[in-house]
């Protein structure tokens, strides 16, 4: 059985092989190491690169008085990349990634808001890792206790478990080829 790190790396390799030209939102202030050719003021080609230091969840864990499931920290602390357009069993998913250290901090802020919403609604804590592009408001999340990957609507509990582990779920995701830079 592969480790989560091996599953993440294998997905990134499949993505690079199947999507040779990749586009993402260009944020000039970030000076992201993934940026290649700037297409226009909003779009840039990108190439994934390993994070020199993993995104650090320590301060957020301390502030929220909780620990995040290791799979969440591993996913967001391994690579800098644009979001990955994936196919999972016939469904299009956008797997969220961080482009730079600054983007990682923005992600941590968004995770904070999500956790606080879950607490206010008295729902099990999850962390979003992706978006279902077929339906507005459909999130791909990791259950913070079990590590299960599932689907949930914004403000609702996970309603469909896709996999018991992130590694197994990633192994079943396939890159979706973008047809143009505005995909």
From Swiss-Prot:
Keywords: Cell inner membrane, Cell membrane, Membrane. Its main location: membrane. InterPro entries: Syd, Syd_sf. It comes from the Bacteria. Pfam families: Syd. It is a peripheral membrane protein. GO terms for cellular component: cytoplasmic side of plasma membrane. It is found in: Cell inner membrane. The keyword Cell inner membrane applies. Gene3D superfamilies: Syd protein. CDD domains: Syd. Disulfide bonds: none annotated. HAMAP family: Syd. Interacts with the SecY protein in vivo. May bind preferentially to an uncomplexed state of SecY, thus functioning either as a chelating agent for excess SecY in the cell or as a regulatory factor that negatively controls the translocase function. Belongs to the Syd family. NCBIfam families: PRK04968.1. This is Protein Syd. It comes from Idiomarina loihiensis (strain ATCC BAA-735 / DSM 15497 / L2-TR). The gene is syd.
């Amino acid at each position: 059985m592969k480790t989560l790190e091996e599953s993440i790396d294998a997905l990134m390799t499949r993505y690079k092989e199947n999507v040779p030209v990749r586009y993402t939102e260009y944020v000039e202030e970030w000076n992201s190491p993934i940026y290649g050719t700037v297409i226009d003021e909003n779009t840039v080609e990108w190439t994934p690169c390993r994070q020199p230091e993993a995104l650090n969840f320590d301060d957020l864990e301390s502030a929220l008085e909780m620990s995040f499931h290791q799979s969440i920290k591993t996913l967001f602390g391994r690579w800098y990349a644009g979001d990955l357009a994936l196919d999972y069993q016939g469904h299009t998913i956008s797997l969220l990634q961080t482009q730079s250290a600054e983007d990682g901090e923005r992600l941590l802020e968004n995770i904070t808001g999500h956790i606080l919403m879950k607490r206010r609604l008295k729902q099990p804590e999850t962390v979003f890792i992706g978006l279902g592009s077929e339906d507005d408001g459909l999130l791909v999340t990791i259950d913070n206790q079990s590590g299960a990957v599932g689907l949930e609507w914004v403000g609702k509990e996970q309603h469909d478990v896709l996999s018991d582990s992130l590694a197994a779920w990633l192994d079943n995701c396939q890159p979706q080829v973008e047809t143009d830079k505005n995909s």
